[in-house]
Amino acid sequence: MSLSIAGMSWITPLGSGVADVWKRLVAGEAAPVETLENEQNGARYLVRRVPATLTAHLPAHPRLRRASAISRFAAAAGLAALAEAKTPPSLDRVALVFAISNGGVIYTRRFYADIVKSGAQSASPMLFPETVFNAPASHLAAILGISGASYTVVGDGAVGILALKLAEDLIASSDLDACLVVAAEEIDPLVCEAYRQWRFLRDPKKPETGRGMIMSEGAGAVLLERSNGGSEIDQIVPGANFFRRSEASARLGSVVARLENEIGFCIGSANGTFIDRAERAAVGDELPLYSPKIALGESVGASVFWQLITAAKALETGTLPGSSKPPVNSHALVLACGLNQQTGGLTLRGRDRSAFPGSA
């Protein structure tokens, strides 16, 4: 089943306007890198953060009064994606699907830190609701007035593929007019420390090297409808898990094999880890391959949506960042590989089934 993208938005460390961030990516810009310090052990991490100004315009809603950064990112992206739709859907016929990986870590860490320091009696009833994975989806549904189906899908950097597949199933099997699919993540030293111990992070003493990933935060959102022209997701393949890093390229290769259909370029999930080599091996040396994570950072749960929006803009504008020779075939491949063994992918085609204006 093909799905039309009626609206899309992102909140990134490089900005929030889809067109503006896209221009900066094409120009070769990258989001600023900051150093985040862990007060517990003194460790330092390279991160890319979302400027506070990008969520300053949010409506004055009770749900946002004490909401963590992840919920504010999600609200900003979701509202913007809905606003982009030419014909706004009736909210009572819209489902919400939320993709997430680390969740509301800032408030979760504070909640359990108080318990560890002062005992269970110090647990904050205000912080506790923010510790569950579906808190951001709950906030967003309340802010938008969506009272129907609301789902939260938890996974790694490929979780966005699973969320999009769920949205496809919901639209195909119900009376829904549309599905708003949102993903968001926030940065906290606790998350960075976990990835540091797994040896995935870039060495803060060697920021210029391309080895290791730089954590980031933000959100992405797409409003999906039944096929009606415009940019369309043709096929979604959740993919298979891998249990060793050496298996990653084979699992990604099987995803590519199921999606091959006039693919002109690939928007991948390379982030400075083993994923870079696995993806290149899966798609081969000839296919143009670009990863927005190199410029925006590793946003984990939100990353697939940044990749999807990047692919849509590449199809629309006939430009691929970092490539002097634009591809000419009609489909973009979005390939996702997470650090916790998930893979997946999808194909996207442009408005007129021709990837780039003037191409044969």
Task: Report each predicted region and the residues it spans.
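Conserved "HGTGT" condensation-loop signature of ketosynthase/thiolase-family condensing enzymes
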Residues: 1-149, 161, 169-172, 184, ...
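Internal active-site segments that recognize and position negatively charged phosphoryl groups
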Residues: 166
